[in-house]
């Protein structure tokens, strides 16, 4: 009987999963879904149980159903994606954000969230354009972007991110709508790899473009 709050049910299911009582959790979720088949959280929980048991097809079916039930509401999309991220299903979180963009008719929605997911997937080729677009729309996010890149570099064992950053910076230099924030990004990166001469060159360029000539981007 569904006499308990939604929070109680969530914790109950989590306890069953953590205790590896998959059969009991599966039966409970199936009963709940019979009376509430639109509950995306239950679908993801059921999919996770299948995934833990190696039932990939059933798992993907549940995850796919959850995404199809998304409504065009920013909070609902973020909550569903967070549910996927909590179980480290970043590729499904990405699909959630992408579907959310379509529903909201906002192609630039969830830039940071998508970038963070690609970072966790170590898909730097997909990540960098999202970070660049974020800087284009909001140059003030440079500190957040460089912090994310620092995190990625510190966890990049095979040195696969630096070539992507360098390729991105090179392509940015060829843009007709080159922005000062790209110089900030270049200064930061070249300081990380100790290419001080190039860092200085970009710092001078940045200072020349600054409206406030007292702003000297040198330390």
Predicted regions and their residues:
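Register position in tetratricopeptide repeats
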Residues: 18, 52, 86-87, 120-121, ...
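TPR alpha-solenoid repeat register
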Residues: 8, 42, 76, 110, ...
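Short coil turns that delineate tetratricopeptide repeat
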Residues: 3-4, 37, 71-72, 104-105, ...
